[in-house]
Design a protein with these regions (language model features):
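A binding-site-centric feature that preferentially detects glycan-recognition modules on secreted/surface proteins
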Residues: 2-120, 124-190
Length: 190
């Protein structure tokens, strides 16, 4: 993960956007207070940088919960569609290299992009939980963190919402589409 930091202006702009989104979407985090979250965020420069990367790439990150046991806040990309700045990617580096050898141009791969941003791709379980908070990916698709038993065979999974239902599918890891990106999560430690 990059050790990049934000300027004071960038931090203030990001915190303002996060607060506005927090206030506008209270159903995503009932019982949580912005003042508590803000106090934690201002002490976490790496987390702020990761959130700024989520924001910069179109993810519209918002807090979706707080672990009662650990006190950790969980942020997730809450953009209506898969983040625009993270589409046209295959699942992993091997898939990316295969496609590039074929002369195809793509934006990168999920695993490397997520690591560079300091976030984790959503798991299938997290994706289904997110979909309980609204209708996401009704026109796009999002790669999901894929189980080892699938990736070792060259596959990966992705999800979307169609016909009022959430679907999870499989594809080969080298596949990439203009309308398929990935959503990430970030846990803010105590």
């Amino acid at each position: 993960m990059s050790t990049a930091t934000l300027s004071k202006e960038q931090r203030e702009e990001l915190l303002k956007a996060l607060k506005e989104r927090f206030e506008k979407n209270r159903k995503r985090h009932e019982g949580l207070e912005w003042t508590d979250l803000h106090a934690r965020l201002v002490r976490k420069s790496r987390a702020l940088w990761s959130l700024s990367e989520m924001e910069r790439t179109g993810g519209e990150p918002d807090v979706i919960g707080k672990d009662r046991g650990t006190g950790q806040y969980v942020f997730c990309d809450c953009s209506a569609e898969s983040p625009q700045g993270r589409r046209n990617v295959c699942y992993d580096r091997a898939g990316q290299e295969k496609r590039e050898k074929e002369g195809l141009r793509l934006a990168g791969n999920v695993l490397d992009m997520a690591a560079a941003m300091g976030i984790e791709p959503l798991t299938e379980e997290q994706y289904r939980e997110l979909q309980k908070l609204g209708s996401f990916d009704t026109k796009t698709q999002s790669w999901l963190k894929s189980p080892a038993e699938i990736t070792k065979l060259g596959g990966a999974i992705f999800g979307d919402r169609r016909f009022g239902r959430v679907f999870v599918y499989h594809n080969t890891a080298p596949c990439f589409y203009r309308g398929r990106g990935f959503r990430g999560s970030l846990t803010i430690q105590e």
